[in-house]
């Protein structure tokens, strides 16, 4: 039964990810005054399927000097970690109701750094290694602010379980009292998922394509799948943390529809930002984090710790 439940979670996520690639190309197309994919199937709806068939039927080429085992393990690990992060997400009931659900997601997203680092190192190419080191520095840096913002939310929530956030936000979204945190969280998730304007790992002008430059066919598709799965996951997490949907026990599917709509709108904002903004310079990226976000999030964290103590109260206990 658990296997069936797992498949029923993974398959819709993969399907959503496949069509996200189409939505992205359509949005970019319309923002650049062109149509986007419109040949394969009606309105280009079969384009993701055609892309998948093309990539997975290609010959998986590997550089002669690469490390064969790590070269294959890296993309597999990337996708496995991206999918495993969906386990504690409540929709409205999680597949695995972990006591430390948020901590699990944070730890698993940190492990994703290894797949990027291994892919860059195993490729035995200087461009891939530079791209991987950039990605690792960026991901590790922005995880600091993500962790502190999560701590602030948990202090308001009073529990580490994601399901309790639904109860906390029954009457008011956490977005309203904590909008500075929400803004910094959203920008940090952009950087965490290596999306524009923080896509420095894929700087075509200086790094050809980034850490996946030596990958082709199936292994490249796995990295692609992992990236887009992470984008949907981060937006799903944003929807749960800041835009909690109302959950009625008599009508739980309404929560799922509400949650999916919010996730879709946030994901489309990601794509809209990609179409609108140029890429940051690397020093600007690091300056934004270490000199702007980190002091602000630390100050807000101290504020959220001191407020309950000052008011002689404790956060709501589940």
Curated annotation (Swiss-Prot):
It catalyses: a ubiquinone + NADH + 5 H(+)(in) = a ubiquinol + NAD(+) + 4 H(+)(out). It is found in: Mitochondrion inner membrane. The chain crosses the membrane at residues 2-22, 69-89, 102-122, 146-166, 171-191, 222-242, 253-273, 294-314. Its EC number is 7.1.1.2. It is an enzyme of class 7 (translocase). Keywords: Electron transport, Membrane, Mitochondrion, Mitochondrion inner membrane, NAD, Respiratory chain, Translocase, Transmembrane, Transmembrane helix, Transport, Ubiquinone. Coiled coil: none annotated. The keyword DNA-binding does not apply. InterPro entries: NADH_UbQ_OxRdtase_su1/FPO, NADH_UbQ_OxRdtase_su1_CS. GO terms for biological process: mitochondrial electron transport, NADH to ubiquinone; mitochondrial respiratory chain complex I assembly. It is a multi-pass membrane protein. One of its GO terms (cellular component) is respiratory chain complex I. The keyword NADP does not apply. Core subunit of respiratory chain NADH dehydrogenase (Complex I) which is composed of 45 different subunits. PANTHER family: NADH DEHYDROGENASE SUBUNIT 1 (PTHR11432), NADH-UBIQUINONE OXIDOREDUCTASE CHAIN 1 (PTHR11432:SF3). Core subunit of the mitochondrial membrane respiratory chain NADH dehydrogenase (Complex I) which catalyzes electron transfer from NADH through the respiratory chain, using ubiquinone as an electron acceptor. Essential for the catalytic activity and assembly of complex I. This is NADH-ubiquinone oxidoreductase chain 1. The gene is MT-ND1.
């Amino acid at each position: 039964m658990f296997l069936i439940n797992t498949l029923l979670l993974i398959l819709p996520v993969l399907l959503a990810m496949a069509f996200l690639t189409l939505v992205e190309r359509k949005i970019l197309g319309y923002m650049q005054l062109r149509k986007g994919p419109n040949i394969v199937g009606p309105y280009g709806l079969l384009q993701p399927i055609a892309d998948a068939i093309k990539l997975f039927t290609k010959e998986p080429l590997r550089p002669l000097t690469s490390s064969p085992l790590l070269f294959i393990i890296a993309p597999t690990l990337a996708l496995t970690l991206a999918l495993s992060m969906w386990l504690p997400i409540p929709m409205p009931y999680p597949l695995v109701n972990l006591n430390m659900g948020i901590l699990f997601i944070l730890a698993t997203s940190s492990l994703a750094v290894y797949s990027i680092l291994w892919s860059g190192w195993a490729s035995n190419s200087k461009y891939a290694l530079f791209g991987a080191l950039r990605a690792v520095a960026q991901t590790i840096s922005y995880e600091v602010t993500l962790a502190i913002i999560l701590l602030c939310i948990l202090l308001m929530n009073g529990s580490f379980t994601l399901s309790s956030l639904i109860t906390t936000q029954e009457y008011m979204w956490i977005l309203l009292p904590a909008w500075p945190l929400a803004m910094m969280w959203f920008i940090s998730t952009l950087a965490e998922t290596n999306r524009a304007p923080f896509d420095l790992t894929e700087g075509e002008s200086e790094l050809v394509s980034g850490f996946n430059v030596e990958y082709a066919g199936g292994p490249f598709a796995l990295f692609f799948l992992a990236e887009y799965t992470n984008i949907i996951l981060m937006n799903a997490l944003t929807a749960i943390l800041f835009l909690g949907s109302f959950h009625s026990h008599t009508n739980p599917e309404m929560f799922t529809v509400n949650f999916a709509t919010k996730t879709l709108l946030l994901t489309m904002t990601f794509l809209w930002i990609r179409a609108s903004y140029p890429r940051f310079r690397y020093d600007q990226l690091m300056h934004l984090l270490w000199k702007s976000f980190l002091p602000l999030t630390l100050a807000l964290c101290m504020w959220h710790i001191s407020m309950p103590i000052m008011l002689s109260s404790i956060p709501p206990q589940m």
